[in-house]
């Protein structure tokens, strides 16, 4: 029994938490084999996937930056076109205002010319009518004056030349009397 105790004592001196040496060696060999396979085959695939993702992300960022730059350029172009359109609209409004004022001035000038023409035509017509009326009145007055003169004088004024001279003298005397009475007022 003492021998059993000694064997048990020897067995007890061994730490139960530590594995046997052969287990450690085989574990290291397996770890190296798995590590080699992982390093040779699996890790490059992970790196390839990560590189592709990084490239996609970088490409996406680059495309986003390009799109943002294009949008910024388009916005600047839009703003420039808008400013140009506003300037052009202001110029068109100013041109329209100027043309409107010119048209109004032309229409006023035409209206004034038309008015002057109508007034001149009316004055000419009045002068012509006045001359016609004066001529008709002179003729009537002449006949009436000759008739009265024949009755007053008692002789016939059959001679046209005498008649015309007498009528003209009478009318001239009437004009002078009318002018003197108008100047006296």
Swiss-Prot record:
Q: Which UniProt keywords apply?
A: ATP synthesis, Cell membrane, CF(0), Hydrogen ion transport, Ion transport, Membrane, Transmembrane, Transmembrane helix, Transport
Q: Which Gene3D superfamilies match?
A: F1F0 ATP synthase subunit B, membrane domain (1.20.5.620)
Q: Does the keyword Ion transport apply?
A: yes
Which residue windows are transmembrane per the record?
Answer: 24-44
Q: Quote the subcellular location field of this record.
A: Cell membrane
Q: What InterPro entries would the database entry show?
A: ATP_synth_B-like_membr_sf, ATP_synth_b/b'su_bac/chlpt, ATP_synth_F0_bsu_bac, ATP_synthase_B_chain
Q: What terms describe the molecular function in GO for this protein?
A: proton-transporting ATP synthase activity, rotational mechanism; proton-transporting ATPase activity, rotational mechanism
Q: Name the CDD domains for this protein.
A: ATP-synt_Fo_b
Q: Which GO terms describe its cellular component?
A: plasma membrane; proton-transporting ATP synthase complex
Q: Please tell me whether the keyword Transmembrane helix is annotated for this protein.
A: yes
Q: How does it sit in the membrane?
A: Single-pass membrane protein
This chain's function reads: F(1)F(0) ATP synthase produces ATP from ADP in the presence of a proton or sodium gradient. F-type ATPases consist of two structural domains, F(1) containing the extramembraneous catalytic core and F(0) containing the membrane proton channel, linked together by a central stalk and a peripheral stalk. During catalysis, ATP synthesis in the catalytic domain of F(1) is coupled via a rotary mechanism of the central stalk subunits to proton translocation.
As for family, the record states: Belongs to the ATPase B chain family.
Q: Write down the HAMAP family for this protein, in alphabetical order.
A: ATP_synth_b_bprime (MF_01398)
The record describes its quaternary structure and partners as: F-type ATPases have 2 components, F(1) - the catalytic core - and F(0) - the membrane proton channel. F(1) has five subunits: alpha(3), beta(3), gamma(1), delta(1), epsilon(1). F(0) has three main subunits: a(1), b(2) and c(10-14). The alpha and beta chains form an alternating ring which encloses part of the gamma chain. F(1) is attached to F(0) by a central stalk formed by the gamma and epsilon chains, while a peripheral stalk is formed by the delta and b chains.
Provide the protein name: ATP synthase subunit b
